[in-house]
Regions:
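Contiguous beta-strand/loop segments that form the cofactor/metal-binding neighborhood of enzyme cores
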Residues: 69-153, 186-202
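Structured beta->alpha junctions
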Residues: 8-11, 38, 115, 208
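C-terminal helix-rich "cap/oligomerization" subdomain common to oxidoreductases
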Residues: 151, 177-179, 187, 191-232
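A general structural signal for well-ordered alpha-helical segments in protein cores
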Residues: 13-16, 67-68, 161, 185-190, ...
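A short glycine-threonine-serine/GTX helix/turn-capping micro-motif
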Residues: 55-61, 174-183
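Short catalytic-loop micro-motif centered on adjacent basic/acidic residues
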Residues: 4-8, 110-112
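Well-ordered beta-strand positions enriched in small/hydrophobic/aromatic, beta-favoring residues
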Residues: 4, 34, 81, 100, ...
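Predominantly a Rossmann-like dinucleotide-binding segment in NAD(P)-dependent oxidoreductases
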Residues: 2-3, 10-91, 226
Length: 232
């Protein structure tokens, strides 16, 4: 048989792996609030297809799939979704701002992206019944690949920006720096190898990618009608 898989590489980001480990260990307790950002500062509209208004252009199609995939990997599908999409830069022809609220029975997930953020935004803000986690900075793997670096390298995936973990112990709040575990994009390819050899599961089956696509389309409808839409 054939294996169809989708490269949702952001599941192997350093900060996401760190956060996933925290949740698996129950360090934060029950998560009530999860906020995830992909922000940048690019005030000038560039002459490239992603910004020219054609099919699939704009950051809702470009960046939101990563954030949506991470959210449903952690929490599953939401009950409903409310999305605001906009073109905020002068001359913008495609979406350069999004703000999505994914509603769960006891949780709210905020996914945000903009191209007009000169100040640094937190990558993650997570609040739970036992503590909080806040992380700044982006996983370094994409930038290193763009710079022509090749594997293997001993320091691959190391993120020099650590997060802050705040625990609640009785009446006290204890704040500590939390080391960010290394990112690991190569793990996706190792998992694909194992899946092809019949030695492991498909790391990102098509069914999971379809869920993300459905949320992308539902978000567009939500923004169009300025309404909260429930998943079927």
């Amino acid at each position: 048989g054939r294996v169809l898989s989708v490269f949702h590489n952001r599941r192997w980001d350093s900060d996401f792996l760190t956060l996933k480990g925290l949740l698996a260990e129950g360090v934060l307790g029950e998560v009530a609030y999860f906020e995830s950002h992909f922000d940048s500062f690019r005030p000038q509209v560039r002459d490239r297809w992603r910004e020219q208004g054609g099919p699939g252009s704009g950051i809702w199609y470009d960046l939101a799939p990563h954030l949506l995939d991470q959210a449903i990997t952690l929490f599953g599908l939401p009950v409903s979704m409310t999305v605001d999409l906009a073109q905020l830069r002068p001359g913008a022809q495609s979406t350069d701002y999004f703000h999505a609220i994914l509603s769960y029975p006891q949780r709210r997930v905020i996914l945000h992206g903009t191209m007009l953020a000169a100040a640094e935004s937190a990558r993650y803000i997570v609040h739970g019944s036992r503590g909080s986690y806040v992380k700044y900075g982006l996983d370094p793997q994409e930038e290193r690949l763009k710079n022509g670096e090749r594997l293997p390298q001993e320091d691959w995936g190391y993120d020099m920006r650590d997060g802050v973990l705040t625990r609640v112990e009785g009446e006290e709040r204890v704040e500590e720096t939390l080391l960010t575990v290394p990112g690991n994009y190569p793990a996706y390819y190792a998992a694909i190898r194992d899946a092809l050899n019949g030695d492991g599961e498909n790391p990102v089956p098509a069914s999971q990618a379809i869920q993300v696509m459905e949320l992308i389309e539902l978000g567009i409808e939500s923004a169009k009608h300025r309404a909260t839409l429930c998943l079927a």
